[in-house]
Amino acid sequence: MASLLDRKKTAAQVVALARSDEKISAQVLLKGIFTEFIEFHGDRGFADDPAIIGGLAYLNEQPVTVIVTNKGQIPEEKLQTHFGCPEPAGYRKALRLAQQAAKFQRPVIFLVNTAGAYPGKSAEENGQGEAIARNLLEFSTLPTPIISVIYGEGGSGGALALACGDRVWMLENSTYSVLSPEGFAAILWKDSSRADEAAEVLQLTPEKLLQQKIIEGIIPESHSQRRLCRAIKKTITTEMMQLQQLKTTQLLEQRRLRFRKF
């Protein structure tokens, strides 16, 4: 994947790269950024959604809670995770782990790559809308630092429910949008073939989002997954150190102001 420094890409090209099968996986990120990861399972209410991997880990020597969306690596796993689209149990698992992190004063790290929340019948029957809304509500006042990194697709409320961070960063070949370009084109123009045009209108690329101050920064990508993990780790570490210097009241006020300005 070419770096931002190499050449300018169209929005459609960024969308394609964000969706690429060559995109770094959740498992590689966990191993490359954190140590001693211990996975926790289940939402303690209904099920364990494999589209969300979460647990405890060390970032350098700092204990953190890390929550990652998982698109799967083999066909069977991709089907089980709905290609990285969480069900309500996944969002509730994320909330459970984040609340536990706040209880023990651990920072929360979200690594997000999802086209959106799973839109299937089972998800709606089990309260998909409520689960997303609950996360938005609870994360807005969670008394511990939250850092989110979008490393692929950041689609709709399904991504926002995991990206209510004090700091939000994106990999250069990633997207963050209210809906997919295909969905936008189909709804507004009744023509999904105009997806490339819609991608430009949506301004879903990291460069556009940085200009609008929706994200804090862009992490350049590399052909080397090890080098990319180091870059993400450095960014998270720097942001975490700054956030931990704030009093809880300051942290929450800054978070409130961050999202109110949108």
Residue map of PLM features:
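Terminal-region recognition feature
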Residues: 1-186, 190, 200-262
